[in-house]
Amino acid sequence: MLGTGIVNPELDLDIDLVIAQYTRTMSISDRYVSFTVVQPTGELASTVTLPNAPNFQNQTKSDGLGDTQILFSAGLYNLPPLTQENYASFKPDFAVGGLARLTLPTGEYDENKSANLGANRYSIQLGAPITFGFGESFLDPRLTTFDLLPSVTFFGDNDDPFNAGTVSQSALYKLEAHLTHNFNPGIWASIDGVYSYGGETETDGQSNDNKQRSFNMGATLGIQFSKSLGLKLSYC
């Protein structure tokens, strides 16, 4: 259910998630490389109103693990691997990277429910992160960055969907933008925007006429307690 990119005006979702993330960075062939595993867990409650029966509502709850995500990223231009000493003196500027995010169907899923934490399918996102940095170094307490992420996501089929045989989805194109500013070494905030296009679904070969063309905005507050521990709060 999560990660489809589809906006449904007849669907009301209430989602509470706790997200665990492990990241490992390294240098391969003089390039910065990062490996990340993301595991969400939480609870989802949904209310679906049918367009042809507005007085009928289908309510569903799902709790447990969400789908596991595995992310690989690498520096392609002006993102060299940095030692601790070089990191403190490196001046951020225009830089380009590459990423691949694989989502595995490991989340809680019940074919008898109209909404689930898991999507019961694989997906892969390919993108090219672009960064513009404004500051003396990554440790600049007043560092400002502007990040763009053009990407495309390809989806596998869900062969066990609610009240159907197969659900498929066409590629979803996205452009994410984030303007981030450090207020001091331990607190930062960002304004976030996402434009989505495509991602139309088909149920048993019939189009659901739900191609996306949407723009969403939000804000994020980050608090860093130590080099390895931080808290991030987002609203969208």
Language-model segment annotations:
Residues 1-17, 56-58, 111-116:
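Surface-exposed strand-loop-strand hairpins of Gram-negative outer-membrane beta-barrel proteins
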Residues 20-24, 70-76, 100, 126-132, ...:
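Residues on the lipid-exposed face of transmembrane beta-strands in outer-membrane beta-barrel proteins
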